[in-house]
């Protein structure tokens, strides 16, 4: 019987005939004892496969015997019908059984659908909506306000509220404190972070450099040398003393070496303003008399000669001095006023 079913299936299957290819599941002999090949092709465990296949074989055999008995009874009852091709077509029997059992099944529409489905709005509902809107637009009568009836439940609720307010009176203060603390925290969070002040180094231009020190020292040395060179000792003589006697009496003053440390050393506290704008050299407006007076005051400390200057010199005395110097062949120094 199974061979016949397989042959009929192969005849109906046109894809396998056209392509000349039989799928692997059709070539499997399900009723053969060699179940290991089926398990290897399907890809399941042997223990599970053997148990499942044995159960299917037993069920199929019992079902086939039951159907075979019914088909023989139906064939014997219908004697007028001649058998087709010497055997009863079992496919028709299976189809009839399937149709009868499938017709008795409950349909999915009646089983899964809701009992009360929402209806669609019909055209009759439009004037009803309009009538409702008209009713709403009309001025409604004033409804008298009625105070709700005070029941025992409302009284109990009021008592509980009063009791909680009296017992938990300190909670209000605690809540106020917590709210204030939260506000302080929020204010601290909202304030921008103050950046730390960068470490400020002292500017280098405030400190004297080696070049500036050398320049200032050289300027001090030049001024000291010029002042010592220009300071010529003058002896204060009386009017009656002649210039020759004056030259004979006066002796060259020994120059005392000036301590280099006093002028050369510069204090570290000299600022930029003093170095830039302080006048280290003498201006042009100062005359030679002022310089000579300043240097003569310094030279008086080293000399013990007590002399005084002549108040005024006439042009005659100056010319006589020049004549005497040329006659004797001696050279006279230039006057200080030149």
Curated annotation (Swiss-Prot):
Pfam family, one: Msap1
GO CC term (a single one): microtubule cytoskeleton
Signal sequence residues: none
Residue ranges, compositional bias (Basic and acidic residues): 1-14, 242-254
Keywords noted in UniProt: Cell cycle, Cell division, Chromosome partition, Cytoplasm, Cytoskeleton, Mitosis, Phosphoprotein
GO molecular function, one term: microtubule binding
Keyword Cell division carried by entry: yes
Skewed-composition ranges (Low complexity): 216-234
Compositional bias of kind Polar residues: 72-88, 284-297, 312-330
Region: Disordered, residue numbers: 1-29, 67-88, 116-146, 215-263, 284-338
Gene Ontology process terms (BP): cell division; establishment of mitotic spindle localization; mitotic spindle elongation
Subcellular location: Cytoplasm, Cytoskeleton; Cytoplasm, Cytoskeleton, Spindle; Bud neck
Modification sites for Phosphoserine: 165
Additional free-text comment from the UniProt record: Present with 264 molecules/cell in log phase SD medium.
Family from the record: Belongs to the SHE1 family.
Role this protein plays: May have a role related to the spindle integrity function of the DAM1 complex, which is essential for proper chromosome segregation. Causes growth arrest when highly overexpressed.
Descriptive protein name: Mitotic spindle-associated protein SHE1
Organism placement in taxonomy: Eukaryota, Fungi, Dikarya, Ascomycota, Saccharomycotina
Primary gene name: SHE1
